[in-house]
């Protein structure tokens, strides 16, 4: 396979700092050397490449924006770029880092006690512990406020009952950030692996996100100690802030998938000869490639502006919704178009495109469905909430 050289039609690399490019290039090399050679096998077998966790930790990819606690402390643009490169390898790898960083380490750092931070954050940063995030339930997805998982006070702690569904990293997690209603209000809790009454069976037979661990979390009279309550995690809004952190990384990640598909289609079209000339010489194929690089370029600029706003503390969740709404849709369209350039070869695991396309079908839904984000944008521009 030809080495990936990036997609930069408008000279956008010149808008990044040296430090930001250094992070991107280090992760790009890691993906080329360690992820891409093994990911097809893991995708086919439905397994997550756990052997990559120590190397990702060594690169500082886990909780990378957090200051202290053995974390890298990079800015949000660099974090976006590392998500982009990871998903160029596979969405399952990017999802692992995204969940560990934005949905586990970030809420512990933001809402946790000093003791919780000291105990968990260094271990999570080193990859010695893995975390997951439990919000979605079997019957409560886009409306998490209607969750039925409950916590009640007992002597020395809390008793949890309920279930969570579609939980990334659940089956391999050492700790779960779980959201449950206590006295009618949503609170965040830490539930550790091995706690009696807590199980995390893996969900099998997926046709998407196959190189990612997806699990159900069940709580049957699961008693946790008082100190496992996240003291600052009171109210549904605190859970939604976590999702917005993860959603930011998704917006960058899917463009990594789009770049991989475009790059593969471009190289294939230059080598594939039909009617005595490369198919890249035909107007129909050139039109598809032009549309791909056009949408990638627009998404790159959107992501960069979003990252700069986030680094200044000015990014609004509605703006992240627009980026996810645009970028995931365009990445999926690029993957589908790239598959047509590859023809029948496009459905083979020998090529990347169909794997990315299948993964993007999940990303289109998780962390806020495409339709729900359209309602968020609609409410922002009209001032009228259609979903209330």
Question: In which residue ranges do the predicted regions lie?
Answer:
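Flexible, small-/acidic-enriched active-site or ligand-binding loops
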Residues: 146, 194-225
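Alpha-helical interface subdomain recognition
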Residues: 1-91, 96-99, 111-116, 123-128, ...
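Short glycine/proline-enriched turns and hinge-like loops at secondary-structure junctions
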Residues: 74, 143-145, 169-173, 210-212, ...
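Short Gly/Pro-enriched turn/cap motifs at secondary-structure boundaries
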Residues: 124, 139-142, 166-169, 181, ...
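A short, charged helix-loop
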Residues: 215-241
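A short core secondary-structure module
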Residues: 148, 157, 161-200
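A short, Trp-centered hydrophobic/proline-enriched beta-strand micro-motif
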Residues: 127-135
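Short beta-strand-to-turn element immediately C-terminal to the catalytic PLP-Schiff-base lysine
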Residues: 110-112, 152, 178-181, 190-192, ...
């Amino acid at each position: 396979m030809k080495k990936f050289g990036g997609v930069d039609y408008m000279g956008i690399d010149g808008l990044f700092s040296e430090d930001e490019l250094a992070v991107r290039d280090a992760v790009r090399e890691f993906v080329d050397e360690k992820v891409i050679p093994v990911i097809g096998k893991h995708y086919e077998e439905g397994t997550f490449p756990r052997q990559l966790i120590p190397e990702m930790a060594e690169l500082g990819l886990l909780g990378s924006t957090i200051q202290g606690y053995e974390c890298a402390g990079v800015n949000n643009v660099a974090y976006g770029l590392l998500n982009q490169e990871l998903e160029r390898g596979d969405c399952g790898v990017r999802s692992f880092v995204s969940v560990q960083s934005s949905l586990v380490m970030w809420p512990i750092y933001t809402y946790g006690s000093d003791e919780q931070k000291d105990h968990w954050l260094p271990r999570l940063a080193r990859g010695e512990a893995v975390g997951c995030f439990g919000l979605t339930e079997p019957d409560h997805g886009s409306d998490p406020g209607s969750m039925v998982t409950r916590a009640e006070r007992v002597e020395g702690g809390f008793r949890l009952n309920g279930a969570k569904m579609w939980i990334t990293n659940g089956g391999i997690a050492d700790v779960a950030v779980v959201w449950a209603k206590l006295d009618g209000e949503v609170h965040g809790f830490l539930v550790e692996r091995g706690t009696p009454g807590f199980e995390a069976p893996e969900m099998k037979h997926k046709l998407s996100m196959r190189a990612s661990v997806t699990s159900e979390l069940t709580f049957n009279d699961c008693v946790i100690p008082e100190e496992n309550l996240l003291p600052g995690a009171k109210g549904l809004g605190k859970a939604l802030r976590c999702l917005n952190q993860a959603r930011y990384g998704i917006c960058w990640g899917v463009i990594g998938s789009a770049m991989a598909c475009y790059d593969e289609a471009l190289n294939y079209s230059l080598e594939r000869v039909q009617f005595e000339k490369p198919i890249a010489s035909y107007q129909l194929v050139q039109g598809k490639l032009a549309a791909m690089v056009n949408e990638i370029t627009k998404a790159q600029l959107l992501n960069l502006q979003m990252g700069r706003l986030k680094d200044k503390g000015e990014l609004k969740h509605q703006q992240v919704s627009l980026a996810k709404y645009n970028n995931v849709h365009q990445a999926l369209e690029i993957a589908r178009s790239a598959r047509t350039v590859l023809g029948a070869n496009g459905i083979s695991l020998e090529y990347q495109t169909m794997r990315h396309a299948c993964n993007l079908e999940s990303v289109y839904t998780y962390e806020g469905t495409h339709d729900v984000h359209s309602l968020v944008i609609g409410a922002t521009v009209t001032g009228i909430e259609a979903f209330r």
